[in-house]
From Swiss-Prot:
Transmembrane parts of this sequence: none
SUPFAM superfamilies per the UniProt record, alphabetical: Tryptophan synthase beta subunit-like PLP-dependent enzymes (SSF53686)
Pathway: Amino-acid biosynthesis; L-tryptophan biosynthesis; L-tryptophan from chorismate: step 5/5
Organism: Thermococcus kodakarensis (strain ATCC BAA-918 / JCM 12380 / KOD1)
Xref: HAMAP family: Trp_synth_beta
Biological function: The beta subunit is responsible for the synthesis of L-tryptophan from indole and L-serine.
Protein name: Tryptophan synthase beta chain 2
Gene Ontology MF, one: tryptophan synthase activity
Alphabetical GO biological process terms: L-tryptophan biosynthetic process
Tree of life domain: Archaea
CDD domains (alphabetical): Trp-synth_B
Keywords of the record: Amino-acid biosynthesis, Aromatic amino acid biosynthesis, Lyase, Pyridoxal phosphate, Tryptophan biosynthesis
EC number from the UniProt entry: 4.2.1.20
Length: 442
């Protein structure tokens, strides 16, 4: 069972949650003064239109016609499936649906914002985009967006993933991007971390610092971000807006689930449904799933913190493990992040979104069952959502209740096979830090 929308149903507007939040979002702070950040200072880092969108209180932002046309070419609208084989394997009365973002040409949801960011940069006359990537899905998406729109792209990829997922590098190079393992010797912050540990596995926080440092050396370059900030999450809401139309062919969901690193794929599916809850028009539950190795939602603190490891970004009020926290090298490289989207942090604080955390072995076990029943090998990041959906379906089975579960399968795992090999061979390690030293000063 699946629902497929025609191209005419590609959303014409992105949904901006800012005007609907239960409390005003705390302003980002200038890292030099600790005063609210002046938007003008962000223009040296981001494309101008993206800064405007970040600050906008308009509930909807029009999607440019050119972006919608490319959305059609790269696989939007994406299909929504019912996981009937998984339901039977679990013996659950719950009905499980998933939105499959792996159907895009780059294999994940990341292309939704990559195209938007590249479009606005090109329109401004920017020549080069620089970014970070964890597992490589975001770097892949931006590399293709740059190729399609005539922009050079440079990617700093967390070293652990650079080594675990070598074919991600190949795809990015095919799309014309430069790619470097992070930490690298190309930046001051990279050299600092390499001096501390020549084999440093890196992480998203370090890669972000390197990308920003790189951008600040070139007037014709701008930084593109794959998650966390509101304009990124807003671009992803095409997922949930499509899913709302597709679920009309089936039934209303009771619970909506997604994995979380910075929060963009979760927000992409959930925020259009959250809007209906905040307006009092519907009742849904929302479950955000993170790894126990990077538990910013379940064990972090809600404080102002840098978005990167080097302290280059504005300080944002968010759930954080501390910007100097070293995230262990789990195979879900896209979830190896110390912080969280500020908008999602607010929703968690108000009890609208419930966070849960899992070890990577139990996540891979859920992914294994999903692959055997539904035929799709999920990205390790997306497998966290599968684990959350399975646990919820088994809870419904124990309690003898029917329930409709919708989750975001945010990407495929065809280039993540080293993690699956380690899982099958019993070599996968679980990480659950007892203490977070980076929080000692918070």
């Amino acid at each position: 069972m699946k629902a497929v929308l025609p191209d005419s149903k590609i959303p014409k507007r992105w949904y901006n949650i800012l005007p609907d939040l239960p409390e005003p979002l705390a302003p980002p702070l200038d890292p030099e003064t600790d005063e609210p950040m002046e938007p003008e200072k962000l223009l040296r880092i981001f494309a101008e239109e993206l800064v405007k969108q970040e600050m906008s209180t308009d509930r909807y932002i029009e999607i440019p016609k050119e972006v919608r046309e490319i959305y059609s070419k790269i696989g939007r609208p994406t299909p929504l499936f019912r996981a009937t084989n998984l339901e039977r394997a679990l013996g659950t009365p719950a009905r499980i649906y998933f939105k499959y973002e792996g159907a895009t040409v780059t294999g994940s949801h990341k292309i939704n914002t990559a195209l938007a960011q590249a479009y606005y940069a090109k329109r401004q006359g920017i020549e080069r985009l620089v970014t970070e990537t964890g597992a490589g899905q975001w770097g892949t998406a931006l590399s293709l967006a740059g190729a399609l729109l005539g922009l050079n792209v440079r990617v700093y990829m967390a070293r652990a993933s650079y080594q675990q997922k070598p074919y991600r590098k190949t795809i990015m190079r095919l799309y014309g991007a430069e790619i470097y393992p992070s930490p690298s010797d190309r930046t001051e912050i990279g050299r600092k971390f390499l001096a501390e540990d020549p084999n440093h596995p890196g992480g998203l926080g370090i890669a972000i610092s390197e990308a920003i440092e790189d951008v600040l050396r070139d007037e014709k370059a701008r930084y593109a971000l794959g998650s966390v900030l509101n304009h990124v999450l807003m671009h992803q809401t095409v997922i949930g807006l499509e899913a709302q139309e597709q679920m009309k062919e089936f039934e209303e969901p009771d619970v909506i689930i997604g994995c979380v690193g910075g929060g963009s794929n979760f927000a992409g599916l959930a925020y259009p449904f959250v809007r209906d809850v905040l307006k009092g028009e519907a009742e849904y539950e929302f479950i955000a799933v993170e790894p126990k190795a990077a538990p910013s939602m379940t064990r972090g603190v809600y404080k102002y913190d840098y978005g990167d490891s080097g302290g280059y970004t504005p300080k944002m009020k968010m759930h954080t493990l501390g910007h100097t926290y070293y995230v262990p090298p789990i195979h879900a490289g896209g979830l190896r992040y110390h912080g969280l989207a500020p908008t999602l942090s607010v929703l968690i604080n108000h009890g609208i979104v419930k966070p849960v955390a899992y070890h990577q072995n139990e996540v891979f076990q859920a992914a294994h069952l999903f692959a055997k029943t539904e035929g799709i090998v999920p990205a390790p990041e997306s497998a966290h959502a599968i684990k959350g959906a399975i646990d919820r379906a088994l809870e419904a089975k124990r309690e003898g209740r029917e329930e409709v579960i919708l989750f975001n399968l945010s990407g495929h795992g065809f280039l993540d096979l080293k993690g699956y090999e380690d899982y099958l061979d019993g070599k996968l390690e679980d990480y659950e830090p007892e203490h977070f030293p980076a929080l000692d000063n918070y």
